[in-house]
A protein has these predicted regions:
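Positions that flank functional sites
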Residues: 35-36, 157, 206-207
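GST-like domain detector, emphasizing the conserved glutathione-binding G-site
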Residues: 1-129
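Acidic/histidine-enriched, glycine/proline-rich intrinsically disordered or flexible terminal extensions
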Residues: 203-219
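Compositionally biased, low-structure terminal segments
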Residues: 29, 182, 211-212
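GST-like fold's C-terminal all-alpha helical module
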Residues: 101-195, 200
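Residue-level detector of family-conserved "landmark" positions at structurally sensitive sites
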Residues: 31, 66, 156, 201-202
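Residue-level recognition of oxygen-bearing side chains
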Residues: 68, 89, 183, 196, ...
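Short, charged/polar low-complexity linear motifs in solvent-exposed/disordered segments
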Residues: 46, 82-83, 115, 178, ...
């Protein structure tokens, strides 16, 4: 039986897992969390009361958190693209950069986006200012790191790049990556040219109108 993924095409952490699945052509059943499948949300809540997604179900076992799901896929459904290196120290670098993209790019980006959704009287301009400064710092560090790299942590795409793609895609919409960070901009372009990433971007296009800050006319 194929694993089942509960996800939404526009959600950044869902992209992360979808990229991993598409990279290795892993067969799965996609339960899209939207009006076209109203039962999916009810099933998700039964599996994970926090109602966070994505959630993967395999042989009746729920696997939760995007990084853990990708680790699980590498164990149960390995493919030609090794998303976690076999060599332990190389794997540590991949896991570190996975956390870097989630914690230091995705998190401040999410603060900027979430602030826009709030009622105007409850918005937090200072928090947004802090988030923008944090993103500039994160871009600067990453620019130096990517100076001599094609992919985040290895010679080919890994878990780290699965995290990087949605992080940098949406972060550039929320707080544009400046021209001074040319290596980050080039890396983002390479990610968007990768077939698995291009696929998730295309699948999300119908939902761009819902981006709280307004989706730019690009990408």
């Amino acid at each position: 039986m194929k694993p089942v993924l509960y996800a939404h095409p526009f959600a950044s952490y869902c992209w992360k897992v979808l990229i991993a699945l598409y990279e290795n052509h892993t067969a799965f059943t996609y339960r899209s969390l939207g009006p076209e499948d109203p039962e999916a949300a009810t099933e998700l809540e039964a599996l994970w009361p926090l109602k966070k997604f994505p959630v993967l179900v395999d042989d009746g076992r729920p696997v939760i958190e995007s990084s853990v799901i990708i680790e699980y896929l590498t164990l149960r459904y390995p493919g030609p693209v090794r998303l976690i290196p076999a060599e332990p120290e190389a794997a540590l670098e991949v896991r570190f950069l996975d956390r870097y993209f989630d914690n230091y790019i995705m998190t401040p980006m999410s603060k900027i986006v979430t602030n826009q959704i709030r009622p105007e009287e409850r918005r937090d301009p200072y928090g947004v200012e802090e988030a923008r400064a944090a993103l500039d710092t994160a871009y600067r560090w990453l620019d130096g790191t990517m100076r001599r790299r094609t992919w985040a942590a290895a010679d080919d795409l890994t878990l780290a790049d699965c995290a990087a793609a949605p992080s940098l895609f949406y972060a550039d919409w929320a707080h544009p990556i400046g021209e001074t960070f040319s290596h980050v901009r080039s890396y983002r372009a390479r990610l968007l040219a990768r077939p698995s990433v291009a696929r998730v971007v295309d699948e999300a296009r119908p939902f761009r109108q819902f981006f709280p800050l307004g989706a730019p006319e690009r990408d």
